[in-house]
């Protein structure tokens, strides 16, 4: 091989090495690493993660997610588990022979945003991004969130669909289907209940540690930019349902389990993962109160829930 070609290749390899970047983030007491091999603007595409970045940490690393061009394609591979609609974004999921997964995530226009391959417990993920910067950011964020949700499940961490307020050192999580009014109810608390603070408006993390259940802010807060690196013990969960009157009741642990399960990121077909999630939810349901609030979007509903769940 001519010397100038070897030198040129060495320069290319050195450039790749020097442009590779790794950032560590800590959420809910555990860390995850995001490596960018070919995306020099990677960190700038994750502004909501900045409150969670750490230079050094003793927290266990639950996942390493590496983004590189041409590392993963969008072609079907392995056994197709299904095509899943996640709020208008299609997720194609394939089970690989080694027990890992391949996923291809599409944007709301059904254009591919990211393809990634993970091992069975999502502790190692390799991904490639596609499209313009907006599309790449969408794929980047979704990949990290999925990796965190499913690797975190093995550390008794659940990523849950909820809006969370904080009051007097406790966290109150409002649950329900999209459009139920979770964010609206949180805003009613902020308006009518003094010294209430919003922790997260879409995807907080909850964790069982030493017999205590804690809720944490995360980089994932839906349409509301609320990315707080804070944590509080959980005061109560509240399942919301729109109704002409305001009525609240406390649910037994079995109903609490069912409600929490439907609100938690999970994969039914993955038995080890699903069993771990169910065990964590069961332990949480036995330790935390869950209420069912049928309500209007008004001040009375906020005061009713506050007076009952903070007793």
Task: Describe each PLM feature range.
Residues 181:
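Conserved glycine(s) of the Walker
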Residues 185:
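Hydrophobic positions on the alpha1 helix immediately C-terminal to the Walker A/P-loop
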Residues 2-173, 178, 188-197, 205-311:
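A noncatalytic interaction/capping subdomain that flanks phosphate/NTP-handling catalytic cores
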């Amino acid at each position: 091989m001519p010397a100038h070609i070897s030198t040129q290749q060495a320069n290319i390899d050195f450039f790749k090495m020097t442009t590779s970047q790794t950032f560590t983030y800590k959420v809910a007491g555990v860390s995850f690493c995001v490596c960018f091999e070919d995306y020099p603007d990677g960190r700038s595409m994750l502004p909501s993660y900045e409150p969670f970045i750490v230079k050094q940490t003793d927290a266990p690393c639950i996942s390493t997610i590496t983004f590189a061009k041409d590392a993963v394609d969008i072609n079907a591979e392995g056994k197709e588990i299904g095509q899943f609609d996640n709020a208008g974004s299609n997720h194609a999921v394939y089970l690989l022979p080694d027990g890992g997964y391949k996923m291809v995530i599409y944007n709301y226009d059904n254009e591919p945003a990211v393809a990634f391959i993970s091992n069975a417990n999502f502790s190692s993920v390799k991904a490639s991004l596609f499209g313009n910067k907006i599309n790449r950011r969408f794929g980047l964020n979704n990949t990290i969130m999925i990796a965190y949700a499913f690797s975190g499940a093995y550390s008794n961490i659940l990523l849950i669909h909820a809006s969370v307020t904080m009051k007097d050192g406790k966290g109150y999580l409002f649950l329900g289907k999209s459009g139920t009014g979770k964010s609206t109810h949180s805003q009613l608390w902020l308006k009518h209940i003094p010294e209430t603070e919003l922790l997260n408006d879409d995807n907080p993390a909850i964790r069982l540690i030493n017999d205590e259940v804690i809720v944490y802010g995360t980089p994932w807060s839906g349409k509301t930019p609320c990315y707080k690196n804070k944590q509080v013990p959980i005061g109560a969960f509240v399942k919301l349902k729109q109704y002409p009157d305001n009525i609240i009741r406390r649910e037994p642990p079995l109903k609490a389990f069912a409600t929490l399960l439907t609100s938690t990121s999970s994969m039914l077909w993955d038995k080890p993962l699903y069993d771990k999630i169910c065990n964590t939810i069961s332990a949480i349901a036995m330790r935390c109160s869950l209420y069912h609030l049928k309500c209007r979007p008004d001040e009375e509903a906020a005061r009713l829930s506050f007076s009952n769940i903070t007793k």
